């Protein structure tokens, strides 16, 4: 990276089970450090299936804050179910980071649950049902705010067999990529985007 290029923060966001880690692996694995609490939990205790989520979450926050203080590019994963990810995006932007958002949405909390159950069968981590039910609508509710903070955004739907890119925002230019806009997308994305293309 040359001296004029700002560091980059990639934010991979979406409800539990939506496919955030898979999207990161498809887009950037090996290109940029990925601070992911689920992977940290697995590193702490591989045999437990990553059950030490609280400790892993604290370590993830420490790692990403340290990287921002050193102005290193990084990527994070978040459900956007709380305000901490938005605050971190604002903090990074205020220190000169370029913020890129990649959001993966899915239709329902029930689909989240089904995807999580598949992941558990394959040895991945579980998420409590009450958290799944709470985080799905909370994530969608914060999507528009995350897009307003980000310098560029990609919004995907992963409700079907294949992930579809729905919307891209780059340099203030909004491009609708797919004419089929699922109900979750219409409800979550700020109406100001509808009239920008």
Pin down the residues of each PLM region.
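Pre-Walker A (Motif I) flank of P-loop NTPase domains
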Residues: 3-10, 70-72
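The conserved Walker
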Residues: 15-16
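Conserved lysine of the Walker
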Residues: 20
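Conserved substrate/cofactor phosphate-moiety recognition/catalytic segment
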Residues: 23-72
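Conserved nucleotide-binding/hydrolysis micro-motifs of P-loop NTPases
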Residues: 39-41, 81, 105-111, 160-162
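Glycine-rich phosphate-binding loop used to anchor ATP phosphates in small-molecule kinases
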Residues: 52-106, 136-139, 146-147, 154
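A glycine- and Lys/Arg-enriched "phosphate-lid" helix/loop adjacent to the NTP-binding pocket
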Residues: 97-145
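NTP-dependent small-molecule kinase module
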Residues: 145-197
């Amino acid at each position: 990276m040359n001296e004029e290029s700002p560091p980059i923060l990639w934010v991979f966001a979406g409800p539990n089970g939506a496919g955030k880690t898979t999207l990161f692996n498809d887009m950037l694995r090996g290109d940029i450090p990925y601070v992911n609490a689920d992977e940290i939990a697995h590193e702490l205790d591989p045999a437990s299936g990553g059950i030490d989520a609280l400790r892993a979450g604290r370590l993830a926050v420490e790692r990403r804050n340290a990287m921002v203080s050193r102005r290193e590019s990084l990527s994070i994963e978040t459900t956007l179910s709380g305000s901490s990810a938005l605050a971190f995006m604002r903090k990074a932007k205020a220190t000169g980071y370029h913020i890129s958002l990649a959001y993966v949405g899915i239709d329902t909390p029930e689909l989240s649950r089904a995807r999580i159950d598949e992941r558990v069968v394959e040895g991945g981590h579980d998420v409590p049902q009450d958290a799944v039910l709470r985080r799905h609508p909370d994530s969608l509710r914060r999507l528009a705010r995350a897009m307003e903070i980000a310098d560029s955004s990609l919004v995907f739907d992963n409700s079907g067999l294949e992930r579809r890119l729905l919307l891209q925002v780059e340099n203030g230019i909004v491009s609708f990529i797919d004419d089929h806009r699922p109900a979750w997308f219409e409800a979550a994305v700020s109406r100001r985007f509808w009239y920008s293309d």
